[in-house]
């Protein structure tokens, strides 16, 4: 397999990493405070400068509060897409149905965008792959996609699930590319991180949970599935083991949910906080020395985290499926070790 030419990709990522902090700085609120001159000796001037100083302190506090509002507006889900300096797009409101608000939000839009991109991307790659002969080596985008697919197939699905991994490969590939693209689009200007919404990560983890339970039922049957809840202990300990094992069934999807949500949210908070330090402190030196360089560093780190979290979510999903569908040979090995 030929090596993928990544020079253009690296250049593109560097440009994005440089532009995002600058765009955020350019569009952020400028908190200008009037510098106070030396205090005159006259009481009348002093009485005027005192309220001015109080106003400066109030403006500084307002700047910090407004910076926090901007950060939370960027992180949380809402029905407004900001395209500064061009304006805003307000998404349509849908009346609640049975008390449930089903209005379209920016994270919902990003989920649709990710789904559309994946459909188009894999349709193009699949059509090119079908046209290739046995002697042709994949190049460009097809080569890159093949490398990622083979990595998930061999090093994730097959390594963690073992025999019968093919049944779960489509799900694992879908989860990997879906989470990866959601993470990456959150780093694009004017984009939003759908995986920074705990409802999205909880839904993905719920899919993994149900697939894991179905895999366990298929591998061991209802009797074996229920027997697993006892942990292979003496019946006298079942009153302790069954609640523990039952709770353990739900700790795995909870861990998947919190891990992805927290990691994708934390990075954006750090980047925006570093950027707004220069506005709050009103210092160009802070902006040049700390805000912009550190923001670029964290941004590049977020690119790595985007791939890493997609891999971790997929790897843990395959690991949970593999543990749930462990074959009898594995159980006999454990029984033999316990016997000896």
Curated annotation (Swiss-Prot):
GO terms for molecular function: proton-transporting ATP synthase activity, rotational mechanism. SUPFAM superfamilies: F1F0 ATP synthase subunit A. It is a multi-pass membrane protein. It is found in: Cell inner membrane. The chain crosses the membrane at residues 107-127, 172-192, 197-217, 236-256, 269-289, 296-316. Keywords: ATP synthesis, Cell inner membrane, Cell membrane, CF(0), Hydrogen ion transport, Ion transport, Membrane, Signal, Transmembrane, Transmembrane helix, Transport. Residues 1-32 form the signal peptide. Pfam families: ATP-synt_A. Its main location: membrane. The keyword Transport applies. GO terms for cellular component: plasma membrane; proton-transporting ATP synthase complex. InterPro entries: ATP_synth_F0_asu, ATP_synth_F0_asu_AS, ATP_synth_F0_asu_bact/mt, F0_ATP_A_sf. Belongs to the ATPase A chain family. F-type ATPases have 2 components, CF(1) - the catalytic core - and CF(0) - the membrane proton channel. CF(1) has five subunits: alpha(3), beta(3), gamma(1), delta(1), epsilon(1). CF(0) has four main subunits: a, b, b' and c. Key component of the proton channel; it plays a direct role in the translocation of protons across the membrane. This is ATP synthase subunit a. It comes from Pelodictyon phaeoclathratiforme (strain DSM 5477 / BU-1).
């Amino acid at each position: 397999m030929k090596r993928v030419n990544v020079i253009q990709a690296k250049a593109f990522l560097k440009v994005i990493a440089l532009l995002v902090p600058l765009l955020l700085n350019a569009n952020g609120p400028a908190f200008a405070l009037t510098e106070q001159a030396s205090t005159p000796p006259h009481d009348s001037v002093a009485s005027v400068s005192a309220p001015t100083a109080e106003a400066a302190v109030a403006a500084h506090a307002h700047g910090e509060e407004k910076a926090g509002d901007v950060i939370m507006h960027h992180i949380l889900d809402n029905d407004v897409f900001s395209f500064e300096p061009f304006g805003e797009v307000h998404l349509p409101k849908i009346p609640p149905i049975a008390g449930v608000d089903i209005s379209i939000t920016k994270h919902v839009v990003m989920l649709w965008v990710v789904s559309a991109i994946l459909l188009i991307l894999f349709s193009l790659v699949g059509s090119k792959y079908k046209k290739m002969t046995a002697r042709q080596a994949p190049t460009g985008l097809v080569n890159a996609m093949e490398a990622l697919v083979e990595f998930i197939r061999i090093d994730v699905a097959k390594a963690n699930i073992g025999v019968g991994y093919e049944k779960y490969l489509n799900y694992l590939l879908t989860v990997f590319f879906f989470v990866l693209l959601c993470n990456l689009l959150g780093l694009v200007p004017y984009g939003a991180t759908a995986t920074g919404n705990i409802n999205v990560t909880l839904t993905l983890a719920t899919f993994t949970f149900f697939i894991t339970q179905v895999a366990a039922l298929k591998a061991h049957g209802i009797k074996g599935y229920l027997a697993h809840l006892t942990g292979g202990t003496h019946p006298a300990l079942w009153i302790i083991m069954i609640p523990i094992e039952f709770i353990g069934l739900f700790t795995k999807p909870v861990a998947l949910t919190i891990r992805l949500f927290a990691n994708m949210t934390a990075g954006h908070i750090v980047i925006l906080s570093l950027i707004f330090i220069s506005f709050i402190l009103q210092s160009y030196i802070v902006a040049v020395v700390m805000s912009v360089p550190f923001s670029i560093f964290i941004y590049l780190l977020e690119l790595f985290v985007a791939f890493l979290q997609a891999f971790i979510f997929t790897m843990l999903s395959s690991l949970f499926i593999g543990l749930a569908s462990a074959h009898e040979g594995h159980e006999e090995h454990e029984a033999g070790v316990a016997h000896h």
